[in-house]
A protein has these predicted regions:
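Residue(s) in the substrate-gating loop at a strand-loop-helix junction
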Residues: 140
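Substrate-binding pocket helix/loop in short-chain dehydrogenase/reductase
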Residues: 97-98, 102-107
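Active-site helix of classical SDR
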Residues: 121, 156
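Conserved glycine-rich cofactor-binding loop
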Residues: 17-18
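The beta1-alpha1 cofactor-binding region of Rossmann-like NAD(H)/NADP(H)-dependent oxidoreductases
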Residues: 61-71, 103
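SDR active-site lid
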Residues: 173-238
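Conserved glycine-rich Rossmann-like NAD(P)H-binding loop of the short-chain dehydrogenase/reductase
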Residues: 31-46
C-alpha cells in the first residue's frame, strides 16, 4: 500500500462496520483522506478515543433499499464533489441446496449482493466519472463457478461479475476502472450473518481452514489492487485459479471434486 496514492482522495466504503470493510477504513484512517462509510451500524473506528488524520463520515444505510441508498447519495453529493474510489464491499452469503432454497431467499440474496451494489454504483457514477475513479467490488471465488450448497450466493456474485465486466468496457473511454476482487476464506461475520434456505440467520462460525485470512490481510491486497491500473479480476488464492482453469479444461473432474469436497454442505 502506497500512502501517497490515497492522500486527498475521497473514498466510499460499504459494510465498513465490521470485517473487510472495517479493515479498509482502519488502514485509510491513518492517511489524510476523506472516508464515507455506508452500513447499518456505526464503525468501531468512530467509537475509539483519539483523532486520526482521515475525515470519516458514517451514513446509516440499508444497502438493499433503493430509498436509503438515494438518501445516502443525496448527503454525499451535498458534502463532497467527486468520488475517487468506491469499495462495494457489503454482502451476504446463503448456504443451502438449490431445491431447498425458497425463491424469497434468492431474491433477498440478490437484493444485497447484486441489485444493491449496482444501484449504488449507478447512482454514484456521475461523481466517480468526475474524478476518473475506481469501483472495486468484494466478490468470491464462488462467483467463478456454481458451488454446491451455494447456488443463491454463487449466482448473485456471478451476475455482479457480468455487469461490472460490461461496465468496464463501456466506460473505458471515460477512464473509470472496475475491479472484481475474490478473497479466500476470511475471518469475518459473513457466515454468522448469512442465510439458510428459508432466509433465517446461519449463525455459523469461521470456515475451518488453515489458509483462512484476516480482514487486514485482505484489505491490504484490495488497496494494492486499486493502486494497480492493470487490475481487473483479482483472485487472492490458488483455489480460484483452480476453478477457472478446470471449468474449461476438465469440467467433469471439477464437478466430482466439488461433490466430494463439499458433500456435507448440501446433504
Amino acid at each position: 500500500m502506497n500512502p501517497d496514492y490515497w492522500k486527498g482522495k475521497t473514498v466510499v466504503v460499504t459494510g465498513g462496520s465490521s470485517g473487510i470493510g472495517e479493515a479498509i477504513l482502519s488502514a485509510l484512517s491513518k492517511i489524510d483522506c476523506k472516508l464515507i462509510n455506508l452500513s447499518r451500524t456505526q464503525p468501531e473506528l468512530l467509537k475509539r478515543k483519539g483523532a486520526f488524520p482521515a475525515e470519516l463520515l458514517h451514513i446509516q444505510t440499508d444497502l438493499s433499499s433503493e430509498r436509503e441508498i438515494d438518501k445516502a447519495i443525496k448527503k454525499i453529493s451535498k458534502e463532497y464533489r467527486g468520488i475517487d474510489v468506491l469499495f462495494a464491499n457489503a454482502g451476504v452469503t446463503t448456504h443451502s441446496r438449490f431445491d431447498g432454497t425458497r425463491i424469497e431467499t434468492f431474491r433477498k440474496t440478490f437484493d444485497i449482493n447484486f441489485f444493491g451494489p449496482i444501484y449504488l454504483i449507478q447512482r454514484l457514477l456521475p461523481q466517480i466519472k468526475l474524478n476518473v475513479g475506481t469501483v472495486i467490488a468484494t466478490s468470491t471465488v464462488s462467483g467463478l463457478y456454481g458451488i454446491p450448497g451455494r447456488s443463491a450466493y454463487s449466482s448473485s456474485k456471478s451476475a455482479l461479475h457480468a455487469v461490472l465486466e460490461a461496465a468496464r468496457i463501456e466506460l473505458s473511454e471515460q477512464g473509470v476502472s472496475f475491479v472484481i476482487f475474490c478473497p479466500p476464506y476470511t475471518k469475518t461475520k459473513l457466515r454468522a450473518s448469512g442465510l439458510d434456505g428459508d432466509g433465517n440467520p446461519l449463525n455459523e462460525g469461521y470456515y475451518p481452514s488453515r489458509k483462512i485470512k484476516t480482514p487486514e490481510e485482505v484489505a491490504l491486497k484490495m488497496l494494492n489492487a486499486v493502486e494497480d491500473p492493470e487490475s481487473r479480476l483479482v483472485i487472492m488464492d490458488s483455489s480460484g485459479f483452480f476453478l477457472k482453469w478446470l471449468r474449461n479444461i476438465a469440467p467433469a473432474f471439477l464437478e466430482r471434486t466439488l461433490f466430494k469436497k463439499l458433500y456435507k454442505d448440501f446433504h
